[in-house]
Swiss-Prot record:
Molecular function GO terms recorded: cytokine activity; cytokine receptor binding
Taxonomic path: Eukaryota, Metazoa, Chordata, Craniata, Vertebrata
One CC-aspect GO term: cytosol
Tissue expression profile of the protein: Expressed in many tissues including heart, spleen, lung, liver, muscle and kidney (at mRNA level). Expressed in many tissues including heart, spleen, lung, liver, muscle and kidney (at protein level).
Family from the record: Belongs to the IL-15/IL-21 family.
Propeptide stretch(es), residue numbers: 30-48
Classification via InterPro entries: 4_helix_cytokine-like_core (IPR009079), IL-15 (IPR020439), IL-15/IL-21_fam (IPR003443), IL-15_mml (IPR020466)
Cross-referenced PANTHER family: INTERLEUKIN-15, INTERLEUKIN-15-RELATED
Task performed by this protein: Cytokine that plays a major role in the development of inflammatory and protective immune responses to microbial invaders and parasites by modulating immune cells of both the innate and adaptive immune systems. Stimulates the proliferation of natural killer cells, T-cells and B-cells and promotes the secretion of several cytokines. In monocytes, induces the production of IL8 and monocyte chemotactic protein 1/CCL2, two chemokines that attract neutrophils and monocytes respectively to sites of infection.
Record carries keyword Glycosyltransferase: no
Coiled-coil zones: none
Protein name: Interleukin-15
SUPFAM superfamilies, sorted: 4-helical cytokines
This protein's UniProt keywords: Cytokine, Disulfide bond, Glycoprotein, Secreted, Signal
Recorded name of the encoding gene: IL15
Length: 162
């Protein structure tokens, strides 16, 4: 199964840079540069993850055109900015329905990758309690195309928020 982790792509370059700096600066300052460089290499770059989530959603849109899935999914059409984490969690739960209904390996892999990316991006906001938001089962049921368009809209809310 292919799991892409875009935030790890530049890790090896950063490690080589750290080693190079460490070999030239054996003083205390060089050690600090080395340590901070290695720490920064492992930190996720969450701002890029949301763009990758949108790419995966568009890939799913393209893949479902070739198969017929007659499922309706709980969809948040007009989420309030204060409810975006709750809405995102509902979308992620409903993605599993697409994966199950499609029985398509490409869709399954893309859905799994998307869930990992979104959860990684949500990790800093995942424990936020949002009051006054609808539960997943209270949302309107819509077809897959409308679901994916609404999902993209929610992801864009995360991209545009500070």
């Amino acid at each position: 199964m292919r799991i892409s982790k875009p935030y790890l792509r530049s890790t090896s370059i950063q490690c080589y840079l750290c080693l190079l700096l460490n070999s030239h600066f054996l003083a205390e300052a060089g050690i600090h540069v080395f340590i901070f460089g290695c720490i920064s290499a492992g930190l996720p770059k969450t701002e890029a993850n949301w763009h990758d989530v949108i790419s995966d959603l568009k890939r799913i849109e393209d893949l479902i055109k070739s198969i017929h899935i007659d499922a309706t999914l709980y969809t948040e059409s007009d989420a309030h900015p204060n409810c975006k984490v709750t809405a995102m969690k509902c979308f992620l739960l409903e993605l599993r329905v697409i994966s199950h209904e499609s029985r398509n390996m490409d869709i399954n892999e893309t859905v799994q990758n998307l869930i990992i990316l979104a959860n990684t991006s949500l990790s800093s906001k995942g424990n936020v309690t949002e009051s006054g938001c609808k539960e997943c089962e209270e949302l309107e049921e819509k077809n897959i195309t409308e679901f994916l368009q609404s999902f993209i809209h929610i992801v864009q809310m995360f991209i545009n928020s500070p």
